[in-house]
């Protein structure tokens, strides 16, 4: 619940800032109307950056890979006993 309140308060603050810019005419009106679009595009770029950084720092887990291979072999044996063709590998 606290996270939702943070997000909503941030959105209200950004909206108030945007409306203030529209009313004050500090920035030309044609540029001010585009600020929400810039914000959404920037947020998308930030999200893609965070996904990319997460993928670059993704840890390798050799122990988990061995366990996964054991699970795969166990599943193949199980299905072979049930009469299912699981391939030659």
Curated annotation (Swiss-Prot):
Keywords: Endoplasmic reticulum, Membrane, Transmembrane, Transmembrane helix. Pfam families: DPM3 (PF08285). GO terms for cellular component: dolichol-phosphate-mannose synthase complex; endoplasmic reticulum; endoplasmic reticulum membrane. It is a multi-pass membrane protein. Its main location: endoplasmic reticulum. Pathway: Protein modification; protein glycosylation. Disruption phenotype: No visible phenotype under normal growth conditions. The chain crosses the membrane at residues 7-27, 33-53. It is found in: Endoplasmic reticulum membrane. GO terms for biological process: protein glycosylation. It comes from the Eukaryota. Regulates the biosynthesis of dolichol phosphate-mannose. Regulatory subunit of the dolichol-phosphate mannose (DPM) synthase complex; essential for the ER localization and stable expression of DPMS1. Component of the dolichol-phosphate mannose (DPM) synthase complex composed of DPMS1, DPMS2 and DPMS3; in the complex interacts directly with DPMS1 and DPMS2. Belongs to the DPM3 family. This is Dolichol-phosphate mannose synthase subunit 3. It comes from Arabidopsis thaliana. The gene is DPMS3.
């Amino acid at each position: 619940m606290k996270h939702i309140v943070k997000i909503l308060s941030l959105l209200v603050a950004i909206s108030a800032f945007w409306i203030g810019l529209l009313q004050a005419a500090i920035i030309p009106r044609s540029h001010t109307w585009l600020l929400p679009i810039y914000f959404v595009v920037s947020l998308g770029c930030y999200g893609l950056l965070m996904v990319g950084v997460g993928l670059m720092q993704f840890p390798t887990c050799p122990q988990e890979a061995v366990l996964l291979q054991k699970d795969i072999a166990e599943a193949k044996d199980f299905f072979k006993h049930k009469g299912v063709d699981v391939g030659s590998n």
